[in-house]
């Protein structure tokens, strides 16, 4: 039983390796440059960099309403 399961496992490994061999690869330097350019282009829309206005912040402390 272990022989047939070993063959099946190896077939899965070969299939995965064939899939990975067919992928297009990008150099790390090119990927880093693209990521940096994307970050710089979209920095004005990033709430972690620009902050969130208090009127649109759903996590702001709620105001207490009290009736006299």
From Swiss-Prot:
Q: Which residues carry this modification: Phosphoserine?
A: 2
Does Phosphoprotein show up as a keyword for this record?
A: yes
The UniProt entry, under SUPFAM superfamilies, shows: Transducin (heterotrimeric G protein), gamma chain
One matching Pfam family is G-gamma
Modification type Cysteine methyl ester: residues: 65
This protein's GO cellular component annotations are:
extracellular exosome; heterotrimeric G-protein complex; membrane; plasma membrane
Q: Which residues carry this modification: N-acetylserine?
A: 2
Q: Where is it predominantly found?
A: membrane
Lipid moiety-binding region (S-geranylgeranyl cysteine): 65
Q: How does it sit in the membrane?
A: Lipid-anchor
Q: Where in the cell is it found?
A: Cell membrane
Q: Which residues form the propeptide?
A: 66-68
Can you name one GO molecular function term for this protein? Answer: G-protein beta-subunit binding
Give the quaternary structure: G proteins are composed of 3 units, alpha, beta and gamma.
**Function comment:** Guanine nucleotide-binding proteins (G proteins) are involved as a modulator or transducer in various transmembrane signaling systems. The beta and gamma chains are required for the GTPase activity, for replacement of GDP by GTP, and for G protein-effector interaction.
Q: Which family does it belong to?
A: Belongs to the G protein gamma family.
In Swiss-Prot or TrEMBL terms, this protein is called: Guanine nucleotide-binding protein G(I)/G(S)/G(O) subunit gamma-5
